[in-house]
Amino acid sequence: MRDPWPRLRELPFPPLRRRALTTLQVNLGYRCNIACLHCHVNAGPTRKEEMTRETIDLVLRFLAEQRVRTLDLTGGSPEMNPHFRDLVRQARAMGVHVMDRLNPTIVEEPGYEDLPDFFVEQRLELVASLPCYLEDNVDAQRGDGVFASSIRVLQQLNQRGYGQPDSGLILNLVYNPQGPSLPPPQVALEADYRRVLGERFGLVFNQLYTLANMPIKRFGSVLLSRGQFDDYMTLLQGAHRDENLEQVMCRDLISVDWQG
């Protein structure tokens, strides 16, 4: 696998000033039940890296001492870490808002079928990846059957109140392009998602986030191998808008990897 980091270090980026810390993002490990082309940490079923119990205890201590308002859990599939549920319970007991960056298909894996009930019990905010509303596009990016599985799980979540008006159970979806291109305008694409998913599957959700693929790790390596890295970086730089810097996550977020 080719490393894009040396090329990224050469690129200019406008200086940023941090704000007060509000969110702690924690990567609980690189294990995932699927392996996606765009994944920026090379997650997959064969990865073994995961956060230990000792490091999770440090996370909880940090939450308490720094009075962080939001815990943002990611992976891999964060739910595959054996300490996921205990971390969530303890964080929620502190009054911390917890977000789970969810690959919906994990719910259909053996041993994870009760996750929707756990999500409701702890009132987690779910950020579920669904990179398109068309089956062929999703399965081409993530593997055969991923779209159908994702839809079934999202329907389960809707049945438990997620995404429903006035339930307080937040279900947001995430779109990302299949390749080295920019996502469509978010407002228009969200309307398309609502129409297609609602008409075909009866699905509802709170909000759609559109993300550009990060040119690092697996996706960055593919770009380098295909000779598309420079063109993609030019595309990203051409789309830069200074006003978007107000919303950059790293200004009030600290991201912690599985090693702590």
Task: Locate the predicted segments by residue.
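Generic structural signal for well-ordered alpha-helices
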Residues: 24, 60, 88, 116, ...
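Conserved alpha-helical substructure of the radical SAM core
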Residues: 1-75, 79-96
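Conserved strand-to-helix beginnings and helix N-cap segments that scaffold or border functional pockets
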Residues: 81-85, 112-113, 183-187
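Radical SAM enzyme [4Fe-4S]-AdoMet core and its adjacent flexible, acidic
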Residues: 134-252
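Short loop/turn motifs at secondary-structure junctions
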Residues: 35, 67, 122-123, 167-170, ...
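Core AdoMet radical
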Residues: 23, 43-52, 66-81, 92-111, ...
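Short, acidic, Ser/Thr-enriched surface-loop or helix-capping motifs
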Residues: 256-258
